[in-house]
């Protein structure tokens, strides 16, 4: 339709058709469509030789925010998928042509495009949406297919395709890795100061359902799918000076997780922001390392500015804004019945219930004390064991294998602290958390 009639307020576009002129350069034309496309279809209609393929790029195969990679289908050929470097780049409000071939970007050539938007609706139980449609945690299946992922979606979410994943070996000493669909094969360890690395075989996003290839049952993954008002992955380039970055979460972020993508092998920390830092007072002046540490005061990380519903701010700190480097940023927000980003003060007594507004308990919980350095990033989930009798913990910041610390119990409204231990419930201690709900029964 010519008018913007889609979306929650019936004022957004779902599809945009148009054309562009090629310039023959690897810094090809930037095509603004007014939204972040997940699928782009291209066709040259006035080029040398008079013919050009139909190209289909989409996020399910390999349509990245990074400049380097893409996979596509040539619609009028017999190949099922072709991969290449520097062909097309996803942007927050459109896309940029990076290839120089006659089929995509001949100098003076004319090309048409069709750009299609991703999900626009905020998850809502009224329409049958469930937490497991947007989050899953599972052991690997050792699937070696490049079509079906090693880590599957939940049983009631057969088409689950995550956009952000964390991965490790629960039963052994192990790194904990993070990766995103937008960064492709790039990943890094949150429990290590070393830089990013690449893995073109295992870090495989072009599968459905699930994620990854050839991960066996000794590996475990936590997986989030982007959804408006819930979770979203952003990619940006550092400037070395103050900058604001527009985001597409569709809500004000309450937690942000950031890491540098390059250069490959360059040491770097993973940085967190959370609305509960400093007990919720001026949290924009603080950040957390993904390490065994307390909240750090530094106005040069988030530029002394809290995120808004449309952008987040960055200061001059290399950790989040080194000039010329690429960064991944994962944004989280609370959504009733699906996910809760919160904070609490410990009371020093077992039985302390943290009310997340859920009705059937928590599928996943991450907790970190912020006012002392002697605490871990503690992770719990129902697949490995979170119930009325067990709480299997993995610390995101260290290498140790999982164990039953007996700290948490399930509670219908969220989770219960079954201990007075200072890591999760010291009297007067400040804690931040991220919790994902169980599906309603």
Residues of each region from the PLM?
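Surface-exposed molecular-recognition determinants
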Residues: 1-441
């Amino acid at each position: 339709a010519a008018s913007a009639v889609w979306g929650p307020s019936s004022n957004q576009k779902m599809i945009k058709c148009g054309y562009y002129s090629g310039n023959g350069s690897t810094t090809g034309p930037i095509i603004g469509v007014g939204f972040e496309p997940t699928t782009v279809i291209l066709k040259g209609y006035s080029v040398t030789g008079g013919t050009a393929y139909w190209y289909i790029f989409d996020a399910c195969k390999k349509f990245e925010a990074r400049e380097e990679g893409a996979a596509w289908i040539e619609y009028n050929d017999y190949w099922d998928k072709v991969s290449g470097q520097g062909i097309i780049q996803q942007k927050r409000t459109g896309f940029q042509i990076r290839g120089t071939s006659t089929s995509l970007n001949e100098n003076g050539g004319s090309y048409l495009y069709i750009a299609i938007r991703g999900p626009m609706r905020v998850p809502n139980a009224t329409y049958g949406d469930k937490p497991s449609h947007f989050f899953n945690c599972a052991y690997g299946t050792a699937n070696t297919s490049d079509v079906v992922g090693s880590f599957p979606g939940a049983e009631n979410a057969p088409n689950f395709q995550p956009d952000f994943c964390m991965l490790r070996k629960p039963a052994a000493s192990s790194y904990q890795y993070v990766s995103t669909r937008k960064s492709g094969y790039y990943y890094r360890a949150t429990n290590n100061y070393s830089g990013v690395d690449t893995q073109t075989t295992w870090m495989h996003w072009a599968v459905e359902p699930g994620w990854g290839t050839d991960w066996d049952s000794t590996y475990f993954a936590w997986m989030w799918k982007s959804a408006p008002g819930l979770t979203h992955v952003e990619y940006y380039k550092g400037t070395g000076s103050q900058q604001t970055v527009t985001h597409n979460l569709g809500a004000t972020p309450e937690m942000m997780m950031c890491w540098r993508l390059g250069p490959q092998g360059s040491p770097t920390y993973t940085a967190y922001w959370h609305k509960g830092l400093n007990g919720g007072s001026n949290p924009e002046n603080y950040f957390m390392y993904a390490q065994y540490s307390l909240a750090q005061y530094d106005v040069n990380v988030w530029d002394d500015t809290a995120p808004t519903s449309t952008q987040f701010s960055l200061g001059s700190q290399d950790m989040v804004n080194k000039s010329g480097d690429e960064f991944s940023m994962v944004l989280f927000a609370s959504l009733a019945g699906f996910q809760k980003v919160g904070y609490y003060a410990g009371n020093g007594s077992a039985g302390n219930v943290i009310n997340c507004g859920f009705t059937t308990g928590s599928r996943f919980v991450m907790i970190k004390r912020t006012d002392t350095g002697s605490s871990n990033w503690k992770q719990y989930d129902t697949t490995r064991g979170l119930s009325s009798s067990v709480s299997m913990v993995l610390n995101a910041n260290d290498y140790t294998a999982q164990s039953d610390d007996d700290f948490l119990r399930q509670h219908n409204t969220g989770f219960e602290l079954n201990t007075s231990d200072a890591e999760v419930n010291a009297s007067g201690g400040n804690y931040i958390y991220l919790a994902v709900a169980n599906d309603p029964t």
